[in-house]
């Protein structure tokens, strides 16, 4: 049965999108709005929810996840690698984390651009009107707990209207507040709560306040011309 499902998955990605969407909703139980779209990508979480006008670009891999949710008018650009470690398996890894969820939740009007790696062993929650910009950022929710010598994971949260610069690293347990910017090549390794700040450095800290009337923070359409 597993081999049959794998064959179906492989065949489906080459079908015209209207037919492909019908198969994904009927066979896998996915909830995909009629105006949403997935291009040539291997996107097979346990559950997929795509809002109106959301889209996933080509050559995206999203596997071993409990859930992927894209809000309306949100997008995942090409060549993003999105992985996790689903719950409910017989593996000893993360067995002590009973409330863990392997999921990517993206709000409305948000964008993950190109060539990023998102490790969703624990949840990654990205708010509304967020941009994960540039290339080669890594959002890593799991690592090794040196003290206990075992795999451990913690969620990552990116607040509404935040902007994540290129080639950043965000570790499990980190939180970027709403209305904030994470500077390029920065390392975010803890939870912050002060809004309207530029966070930058290795490790990142608040380095400069940002104008609250910045147009990026007040827009009502996610797409930026």
Language model features: what each stretch is:
Residues 136-153, 161:
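A contiguous binding-surface segment within folded domains or other stable secondary-structure elements
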């Amino acid at each position: 049965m597993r081999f049959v499902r794998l064959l179906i998955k492989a065949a489906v990605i080459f079908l015209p999108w209207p037919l492909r969407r019908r198969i994904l909703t009927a066979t896998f139980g996915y909830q995909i709005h009629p105006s949403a779209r997935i291009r040539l990508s291997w996107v097979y979480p346990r559950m997929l929810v795509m809002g109106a006008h959301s889209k996933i670009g080509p050559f995206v891999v999203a596997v071993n996840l409990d859930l992927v949710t894209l809000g309306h008018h949100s997008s995942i650009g090409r060549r993003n690698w999105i992985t996790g470690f689903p719950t409910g398996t017989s593996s000893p890894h993360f067995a002590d984390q009973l409330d863990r969820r392997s999921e990517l939740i993206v709000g409305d009007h948000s964008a993950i651009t190109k060539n990023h790696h998102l490790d969703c062993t624990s949840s990654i929650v990205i708010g509304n009107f967020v941009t994960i910009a540039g290339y080669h950022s890594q959002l890593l929710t799991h690592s090794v707990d040196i003290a206990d010598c075992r795999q451990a994971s913690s969620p990552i949260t990116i607040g509404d209207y935040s902007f994540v610069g290129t080639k950043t690293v965000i570790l499990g347990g980190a939180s970027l507040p709403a209305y904030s910017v994470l500077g390029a090549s920065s390392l975010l390794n803890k939870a912050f709560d002060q809004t309207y700040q530029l966070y930058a450095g290795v490790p990142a800290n608040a380095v400069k306040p940002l104008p609250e009337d910045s147009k990026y923070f007040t827009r009502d359409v996610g797409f930026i011309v």
